[in-house]
């Protein structure tokens, strides 16, 4: 049963033919009734995910396991660049359609050089995609009350959609109190206890996912690396990376083990993993002997080691010994250039997500995705959804309502629904 998608601003159309999509058709053949007219049936969530997976075109390339050659390098710089370009396009559209520009506020306490560098890089990244950035710098001896005051002001500021408190804070401040003060709707770092709690619960979704773990999973998705049913090991159990990374892998239906400083036989446990995410901050700790042939390795560690040949006197390496592990694994992230660029890219993505949620702004792609989910679940609900869009709740605003977004035709060429 072919279904034709056409964007009425274009003369092109896409034909989705379920009969020729063999894997999907085999899964769903008993759900569909062959007919010249357009018909729908209730499908389960598993099938929806199957459709989504097979119709997606966002991945970069499939990673093939090849034990005879060195591992494929997962290019975090390239993926982060793609994401930043995608974010910039959506921000431009948001500005044009509803006049809103996402805003990110950063609070920096003290004069740590590394923290100042991180904040400077975040501001530069915001500027590159069109996000307004706001910055507050406080002295090392500032009080916790001063920090909370600025957080409260940003919580109430409608031009600010994301708030980030640069860690670590000075020792005289209660870090948890400060993080808890950030409005959960603007917690783009994803560290609020309610966001972490929702991440841990089945059937609940956090408003935001912590940026570094989110970047790790995004790399796996963009390279078409399967997670479902795989054995995954997370090395490290920090609140910032290890714990949320394990929760995300579990949400993707992986069987997850966490290796930490009290784990006995960490090498033996790690060697069973199809996917390894390491975030412990120990240079070259994971050797080639720890890696199962064909495993995929995501290295979060950034560790300086002495290097007399380097102008700086040191070089950066990860937790995983790249030279050894790359001979065994099927894919591996480099350090630098792997997970690092993804962290800031995910921060930009979370800030955009916050602005879209606050202002109820959605892209055509998101409208189509949600519509098809409704179609597969229930035809009548889909009709109600389409009429809601047309009549009174167009997500792209009044100007967009004047032009159809897309149309669906049956086999006889008759237009079934016109969305506009």
Question: What are these model-derived regions, one by one?
Answer:
Residues 69, 74, 161-231:
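Anion-binding alpha/beta catalytic cores of soluble intermediary-metabolism enzymes, centered on
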Residues 178, 196, 301-358:
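Rossmann-fold NAD(P)-binding glycine/threonine-rich loop
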Residues 408-409:
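Intrinsic disorder/low-complexity segments
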């Amino acid at each position: 049963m072919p279904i034709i998608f056409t964007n009425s601003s274009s003369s092109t159309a896409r034909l989705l033919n379920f009969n020729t999509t063999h894997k999907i058709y085999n899964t769903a053949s008993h759900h569909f009734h062959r007919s010249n007219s357009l018909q729908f049936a209730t499908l389960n969530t598993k099938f929806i995910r199957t459709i989504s997976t097979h119709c997606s075109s966002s991945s970069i390339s499939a990673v093939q396991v090849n034990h005879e050659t060195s591992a494929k390098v997962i290019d975090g710089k390239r993926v982060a660049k793609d994401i930043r370009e995608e974010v910039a396009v959506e921000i431009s559209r948001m500005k044009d359609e509803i006049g809103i520009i996402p805003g990110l506020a950063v609070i920096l306490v003290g004069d740590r050089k590394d923290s100042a560098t991180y904040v400077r890089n975040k501001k530069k990244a915001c500027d590159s995609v069109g996000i307004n950035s706001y910055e507050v710098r406080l002295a090392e001896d500032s009080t916790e009350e001063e920090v909370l005051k600025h957080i409260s002001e940003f919580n109430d500021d409608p031009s600010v959609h994301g708030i980030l408190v640069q860690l670590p804070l000075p020792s005289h401040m209660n870090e948890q109190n400060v993080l808890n003060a950030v409005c959960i709707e603007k917690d783009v770092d994803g560290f609020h206890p309610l966001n972490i709690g929702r991440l841990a619960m089945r059937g609940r979704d956090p408003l935001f996912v912590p940026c570094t773990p989110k970047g790790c999973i995004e790399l796996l998705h963009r390279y078409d690396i399967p997670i479902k049913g795989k054995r995954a090991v997370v090395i490290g159990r920090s609140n910032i990376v290890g714990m949320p990374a394990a929760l995300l892998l579990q949400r993707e239906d992986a069987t997850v083990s966490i290796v930490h400083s009290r784990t006995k036989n960490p090498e033996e446990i790690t060697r069973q993993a199809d996917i390894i995410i390491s975030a412990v901050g120990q240079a070259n700790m994971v050797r080639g002997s720890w890696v199962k042939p064909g495993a995929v390795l995501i290295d979060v560690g950034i560790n300086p080691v002495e290097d007399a040949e380097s102008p700086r006197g040191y070089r950066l390496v990860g937790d995983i010994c790249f030279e050894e592990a790359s001979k065994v694994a099927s894919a591996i992230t480099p350090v630098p250039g792997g997970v690092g660029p993804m962290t800031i890219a995910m921060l930009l993505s979370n800030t955009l997500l916050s602005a879209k949620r606050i202002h109820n702004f959605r892209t055509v792609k998101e409208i189509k995705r949600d519509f098809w989910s409704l179609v597969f679940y229930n035809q009548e609900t889909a009709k109600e959804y389409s009429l809601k869009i047309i009549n009174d709740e167009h997500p792209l605003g009044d100007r967009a309502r004047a032009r159809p977004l897309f149309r669906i035709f049956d086999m006889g060429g008759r237009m079934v629904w016109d969305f506009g």
